[in-house]
């Protein structure tokens, strides 16, 4: 094996030819070795040519020794093509993060668009420099077919082999292999046709930092830290399911191709040069260390409001909010809302209670959950309650209850319950 090592490391032709690609986790041949090749990755044909070369010039024929020597050589000679690309960029000082989606796709030049794009691009960079880092966001472009959404993401990935749109189903047994070796992965229209259950699966999928699986010829499974980021495209405006917790992993941006300065495919060279400088700007921010993988609280709040325009319509919230805006009391409970606001009779079932709690805790303006149980009087009795924002919480009695009968008496019950 030592003789094989010497040949691979000292022969003028072979020296430096073999490198371990940390993105694909495959051996790459990075120089011309004199035989015809169709791809950079080392394959069975390359091994045959290498063995023939070593036998002819060095008399080395033990294929196991050659393979082990090659493993040692590439372990010492690793590289990451995306990191090398990013490290080699030099920014010209012109701001592009703020304008890129307007330039190519006609998106508004809003602060929300800027913060969403910046977060996503920094996440892409962080994922290749720190594989497996926590990054849960998906940038979603929403707009007409033919606007160039997928082409933009393909160009954003720089090389076609660093981009994939082959991830169609979350339950595909080959889903992890389809992710491997790619930087930006598009889930085209997956959200637009997804059910609430499948969207929850997508959220869980986005939250993972690694995959554990065994390749076909490996003996044991191993952890593979994620180096990719996910993007979404949709022609459907309200592509997000109703989720009153906010669908926070998704960063939707509305595009309008009629307002774009240029179509991304109009001049490929100019588009790619623009995107090179986009990544150069991102790297200046990344190297500064003045960034975070979390949105500032005020931006996160605006994003929650922004996402509502892309979610399925929430009619129940509107009914409850309108009723509360005209309600004279300062305290409400779920059963009171069920009977009075939603005009239902009797006791609510668990599903209805959970929905009301979800609405009151996440989407209603001007009301806060109270820390104690409240006595509402007949027919509601003691209930967990919400109080009007700005109302000072009274002191609970010795049993931990607060009487709100006076507020409740202001209501006129139009029916028996």
Regions found by a protein language model. Name each.
Residues 1-95, 111, 115, 346-351, ...:
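N-terminal nucleic-acid engagement/recognition segments and initiation subdomains in replication
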Residues 70-180, 184, 335, 342:
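P-loop NTPase catalytic core of nucleic-acid-dependent motor ATPases
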Residues 175-180, 215-233:
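AAA+/SF3 P-loop NTPase mechanochemical coupling elements
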Residues 183-206, 241-246:
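Conserved AAA+/SF3 P-loop NTPase catalytic/coupling segment centered on the Walker-B
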Residues 199-222:
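Conserved catalytic/switch belt of AAA+ P-loop NTPases
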Residues 240-260:
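A short helix-turn-beta junction within AAA+ P-loop NTPase domains corresponding to the substrate/partner-engaging
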Residues 285-329:
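Conserved alpha/beta core segments of nucleic-acid transaction machinery
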Residues 324, 331, 336-358:
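Conserved helicase/translocase motor-coupling segment
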């Amino acid at each position: 094996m030592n003789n094989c090592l010497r040949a691979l490391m000292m022969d003028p032709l072979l020296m430096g030819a073999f490198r371990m690609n940390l993105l694909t986790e495959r051996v790459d041949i990075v120089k011309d070795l004199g035989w015809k090749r169709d791809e950079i990755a080392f394959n069975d044909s390359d091994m045959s040519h290498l063995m023939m070369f070593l036998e002819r010039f060095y008399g080395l024929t033990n294929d196991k020794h050659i393979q082990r020597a090659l493993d040692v050589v590439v372990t010492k000679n690793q590289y990451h093509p995306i990191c090398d690309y990013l490290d080699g960029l030099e920014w010209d000082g012109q701001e592009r993060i703020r304008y890129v989606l307007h330039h190519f796709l006609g998106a508004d030049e809003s602060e929300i668009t800027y913060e969403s794009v910046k977060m996503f691009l920094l996440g892409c960079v962080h994922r290749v420099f720190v594989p497996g880092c926590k990054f849960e966001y998906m940038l979603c472009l929403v707009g007409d077919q033919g606007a160039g959404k997928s082409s933009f993401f393909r160009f954003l990935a720089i090389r076609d082999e660093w981009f994939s749109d082959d991830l169609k189903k979350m339950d595909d047994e080959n889903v992890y292999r389809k992710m491997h070796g790619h930087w930006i992965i598009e889930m085209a229209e997956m959200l637009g046709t997804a059910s609430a259950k499948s969207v929850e699966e997508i959220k869980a999928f986005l939250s993972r930092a690694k995959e554990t699986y065994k390749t076909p010829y490996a003996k044991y499974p191993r952890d593979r830290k994620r180096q990719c980021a996910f993007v979404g495209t949709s022609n459907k405006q309200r592509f997000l399911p109703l989720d009153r917790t906010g669908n926070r992993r998704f960063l939707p941006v509305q595009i309008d191709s009629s307002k774009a300065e240029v179509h991304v495919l109009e001049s490929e060279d100019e588009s790619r040069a623009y995107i090179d400088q986009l990544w150069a700007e991102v790297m200046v921010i990344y190297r500064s260390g003045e960034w975070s993988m979390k949105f500032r609280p005020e931006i996160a709040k605006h994003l929650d409001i922004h996402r509502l325009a892309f979610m399925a319509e929430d009619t129940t919230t509107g009914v409850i909010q309108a009723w509360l805006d005209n309600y004279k009391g300062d305290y409400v409970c779920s059963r009171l809302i069920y009977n009075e606001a939603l005009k239902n009779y009797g006791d609510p079932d668990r599903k209805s209670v959970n929905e009301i709690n979800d609405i009151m805790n996440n989407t209603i303006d001007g009301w806060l959950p109270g820390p104690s149980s409240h006595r509402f009087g007949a027919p509601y009795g003691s209930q967990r309650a919400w109080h009007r924002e700005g109302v000072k919480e009274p002191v609970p009695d010795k049993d931990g209850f607060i009487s709100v009968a006076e507020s409740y008496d202001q209501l006129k019950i139009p029916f028996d319950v």
